[in-house]
Amino acid sequence: MPTYKPTVFKHHQRRDGKFRVSIRITHNRKSVYMPTDVYVSRKQITTDFKTIKDTEVVRMIDRDIIEYENILLRNLGSNLSQYTARELADYIEKYTTTDGGA
């Protein structure tokens, strides 16, 4: 079963000073990062960039993670172990961009 973690990278800073939040998907000891449409300012994260402090942002990201889990469980079920982290991320991306298209 994959695990998920919201991640912010220092080097992903926009010109307006905000940072894009990505979701790290780890499966079978391999990780991939899926970018989100969520951006945070320095005030909304800890100084070490490890934790998002803004609870509203955390709720939004948690909703995305729950959606990702539901997509995988509903469509792939117990076959998750057959896929790589990259394949799972690609599947989620395909499914979310086509609104249920897989």
Regions found by a protein language model. Name each.
Residues 16, 29-102:
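N-terminal helical hairpins
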Residues 1-11:
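Short, Gly/Pro- and small/polar-rich lid/capping loops
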